[in-house]
Amino acid sequence: MKTRSKLAAGFLTLMSVATLAACSGKTSNGTNVVTMKGDTITVSDFYDQVKTSKAAQQSMLTLILSRVFDTQYGDKVSDKKVSEAYNKTAKGYGNSFSSALSQAGLTPEGYKQQIRTTMLVEYAVKEAAKKELTEANYKEAYKNYTPETSVQVIKLDAEDKAKSVLKDVKADGADFAKIAKEKTTATDKKVEYKFDSAGTSLPKEVMSAAFKLDKNGVSDVVSTVDSTTYKTSYYIIKVTDKTEKKSDWKSYKNRLKEVILKDKTSDRSFQNKVISKALEKANVKIKDKAFAGILSQYATTSGSSSLKK
């Protein structure tokens, strides 16, 4: 089952321990779950057997985060938003949605709770990120910011072909735009791009190479590897226009705000600090040694010892 964002990586499946924890308030640890000739299996027997498994550890973590964030931010996420996200995912899977849920060990309600918890954490992280919009952070973001650059790009799938095309575009009188349209292997045949340093329309390696060029400059072959398919692509870039960077960071305040918020909300360390503070505020304490380490990734600030035991 695909999750909504990187934040969702910590919220996988609500499995046996979560169910058992819900039941334990109604039954005694000595309650028989299974009976047989000469023996029984009690709630306590089952709990002791499964609690150290990876699935149980993840389930307990999910249950803790769900309870903590629902208590602190529950009114910030409506049932309507959860349903909309759920229905969007269901529509994407089509007729295979039920089987996808089943394979992930989820019920519809369990998945909705997962979505809700993810949204609650996302809200908390976004609110914390807004507090990072200080003048110092704006100035730091400005230092690393490059304004809009216009380029023509040739994408190729083979290195030898890319080297051959590079010779063509660097020949005297070569029409880069014409060659780009003829040679690019991009599925959409797009060759014209505009982007700043916060853009995502092209691989970072390609944008970095473009920023180093002067206007009308042509790059050497730039190779990139797709992190999903591990396929290597090759690019040749020509800069057709460059915007001069203004001296006052306030000229880019709105764009820099987007950059700061995006950097913070996608930073796993920042996310963990936000979660850590929420856990500390809730005074979460682990009473069963079997789960002693499940919150260790969030014990990143002083005073976090209560998250460990």
From Swiss-Prot:
The molecular function terms of the Gene Ontology recorded here are:
peptidyl-prolyl cis-trans isomerase activity
Which positions are lipidated as N-palmitoyl cysteine? C23
The signal sequence is 1-22
UniProt-annotated location(s): Cell membrane
Q: Which InterPro entries does the record match to this protein?
A: Foldase_PrsA, PPIase_dom_sf, PPIase_PpiC, PrsA_foldase, Trigger_fact/SurA_dom_sf
Q: Which reaction does it catalyse?
A: [protein]-peptidylproline (omega=180) = [protein]-peptidylproline (omega=0)
Q: Name one GO cellular component term.
A: plasma membrane
Task: Give me any GO biological process, just one.
Answer: protein folding
* Lipidation positions, renumbered (S-diacylglycerol cysteine): C23
Q: Which UniProt keywords apply?
A: Cell membrane, Isomerase, Lipoprotein, Membrane, Palmitate, Rotamase, Signal
Report the family membership.
Belongs to the PrsA family.
Q: PANTHER family per the record?
A: FOLDASE PROTEIN PRSA, PEPTIDYLPROLYL ISOMERASE
The protein depicted here goes by the name Foldase protein PrsA
- Origin organism is Streptococcus agalactiae serotype III (strain NEM316)
Q: Which gene encodes it?
A: prsA
